[in-house]
A protein has these predicted regions:
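Juxtamembrane regions of bacterial inner-membrane/periplasmic proteins
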Residues: 103, 148-161, 181-186, 198-525
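Hydrophobic, Leu/Ile/Phe/Ala-enriched alpha-helical segments that form helix-helix packing faces
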Residues: 42-47, 91, 95, 155, ...
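N-terminal amphipathic/hydrophobic interface segments
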Residues: 8-74
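Short, solvent-exposed loop/hinge segments that bridge or flank secondary-structure elements
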Residues: 171-191
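N-terminal Lys/Arg-rich, disordered targeting/topogenic segments
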Residues: 1-8
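Short amphipathic alpha-helical segments
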Residues: 6, 80, 465
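Flexible beta-edge/linker motif
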Residues: 56-171, 184, 196-224, 236, ...
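Generic structural motif
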Residues: 51-55, 89, 253, 367
């Protein structure tokens, strides 16, 4: 028995000695192993994207600390994309043993990223290269929950609990225009971060401040952005690239990830904006102002779908809504569902919350009574003819107390009409008996009246300004031909468009048209 114990002890000692020797060898050779691993990755990346990636030194300090100096990334025959003077990262040792990367502390100095485009050549073209080998249809299934989980795990893994980033510069230049964002120092202490941000777009300079929290253990992200000296934040690049001018006072955001049933991911959080001003010609010819907007959201992500739960609360000014959205991919075809139901609420909550600049004719309108609203849009792109569209705004004891900027009842008597072309007034004349070309309805042939009615709006006497079936058929046709090919306007809608609205084709005009039509039909103006 003693002999076996002796042999076992000897075997244990030998195994332990070998293990110590191996670990010692790995420790002393860790820099060589690290450089070889990184070198292989760099070589593959260089060959795949046509880059030149260089650094002066890469080494490990201890068992979990990495130092890198003078890194540069230069695309072939392009301007330098990235330079980094020095980087020090301390990783989680136990996570590293399991093959996972979790950054505990990071210090970076003089990180500079430059996106440069001259004519049609850019130093970031490689980012948009198509993959050489496409995955055959049906060979793999998309798992959106898995994708979201991987992205968030990567994000939380690389965002440190503590760290300092000094002199971070990110710039974009196209010909003579440029945007430069500079962070003098970003400090992260016990999951909380704060920093000043200097922004310059061409000759315009701004000074922002950001702060927030990144909590890896709770999978939570919080951030706040505001301008210094009580100025508005003007988001750069968007005006030059998309023609959109967006300004705001403050922006806050939070995100928390949790696990649901059957491998689903639940994302909850809030986003809020104060003092928002938006201009884009496709939205409205005037700047749209939103005093306060907020969303408390709950998003469920599954293997083949993403869903905005109806417990989500959207608030703009006085109005509160609970929308429902779902996008699902079935056999490589999308299926979208959108729904909104709001039970009886004071009518002036809606009309008093309309963003300024979006509905110019209705600004200042005062109403009384109650409203309720139901909306449903269900689109299966595999079966476009099955499309469902329901929209109904009901009223109870509703009345207009005071008109806004425009008298919606002016068509009850003679009024002055101005015709516009390309946004410019071309002619002004009265609509009524005083105009020499005015023709009363009873002087027009009943056959002509019926012909116009049947060709334009056969159900004119039976609806209240809207034909949901006509809108549904028009939307189905547009989806089939993949363009706006058919309209679903009633005569009332065409009348409102010509009398009250301009010819600008934008989202605001269509929404304002619908509201004015409903008011005219409901109040019999």
């Amino acid at each position: 028995m003693g002999k076996y114990r002796t042999k076992g002890s000897i075997a244990l000692i030998i195994t332990g000695s070998v293990l110590i020797l191996v670990l010692t060898g790995l420790y002393w050779g860790r820099n060589g192993i690290l450089c070889r691993m990184v070198g292989k990755r760099i070589l593959r990346t260089e060959q795949k994207y046509g880059l030149s990636i260089r650094y002066d030194a890469l080494r490990m300090k201890g068992l979990n600390e990495i130092e890198l100096s003078n890194l540069s990334v230069v695309p072939d025959k392009r301007d330098t994309l990235l330079t980094l003077h020095a980087l020090n990262m301390r990783l989680s040792f136990w996570k590293l043993l399991r093959g996972k990367i979790e950054v505990r502390n990071v210090t970076a100095d003089r990180l500079k990223v430059s996106f440069i485009k001259a004519d049609s050549t850019a130093n970031y073209d490689f980012l948009f290269l198509k993959k050489e080998q496409e995955v055959p249809a049906g060979s793999a299934q998309t798992d959106y929950a898995h994708r979201v989980n991987r992205i968030l795990n990567l994000l939380y893994g690389f965002l440190p609990e503590n760290g300092t980033l000094r002199q971070v510069d990110v710039s974009e230049r196209k010909d003579r225009n440029f945007v430069a964002i500079r962070i003098p120092q970003l400090s992260i202490r016990q999951n909380h971060f704060n920093s000043d941000i200097e922004v310059q777009e061409d000759s315009v300079r701004q000074h922002w401040t950001t702060c927030g929290e990144v909590n890896r253990s709770h999978h939570t992200l919080k951030a706040e952005l505001y301008a210094q000296h009580k100025e508005k934040i003007a988001l750069p690049y968007l005006k030059r690239r998309f023609g959109a001018d967006i300004r705001l006072d403050t922006l806050t955001y939070s995100l928390t990830e949790s696990e649901g049933n059957s491998g689903q991911i639940i994302l909850t959080g809030q986003a809020a904006v104060n003092g928002l001003e938006v201009y884009h010609k496709a939205l409205s010819p005037q700047t749209v102002n939103l005093d306060r907007g907020q969303i408390s959201y709950r998003v469920l992500v599954g293997k083949e779908f993403a869903e905005l739960d109806s417990t989500t609360l959207v608030q703009f000014n006085q109005m509160q809504l609970h929308p429902y959205l779902k996008a699902e991919k079935r056999e490589h075809q999308w299926h979208f569902t959108a729904a909104l139901n709001k039970s009886w609420f004071p009518a002036n909550e809606l009309f008093g919350s309309l963003p300024k600049g979006l509905f110019s004719n209705l600004e200042g309108i005062k109403t009384d009574g109650e409203l309720s609203y139901h909306f449903l849009l269900d689109v299966d792109f595999a079966l476009p003819d099955s499309l469902k569209l329901e929209s109904e705004l009901k009223e109870r004891n509703f009345r207009i107390v005071k008109y806004g900027a425009t008298d919606l009842g002016k068509m009850s008597e003679e009024f002055i009409y101005t015709a516009y072309e390309n946004g410019q007034p071309v002619r002004t004349f009265p609509i009524g008996p005083s105009w020499e070309h005015f023709t009363p309805l009873d002087s027009i042939s009943p056959l002509l009246q019926m012909s116009v009615m049947q060709s334009e709006d056969g159900a004119f006497y039976y609806h209240r300004g809207f034909l949901p079936d006509a809108m549904r058929e028009a939307l189905i046709q547009d989806l089939k031909v993949k363009r706006f090919a058919r309209g679903g306007s009633t005569i009332t809608m065409q009348l409102v468009k010509n009398v009250f609205l301009n010819r600008n084709k934008n989202i605001a005009r269509k929404l304002e048209e619908a509201l004015i039509v409903w008011l005219i039909e409901t109040e019999r103006l």
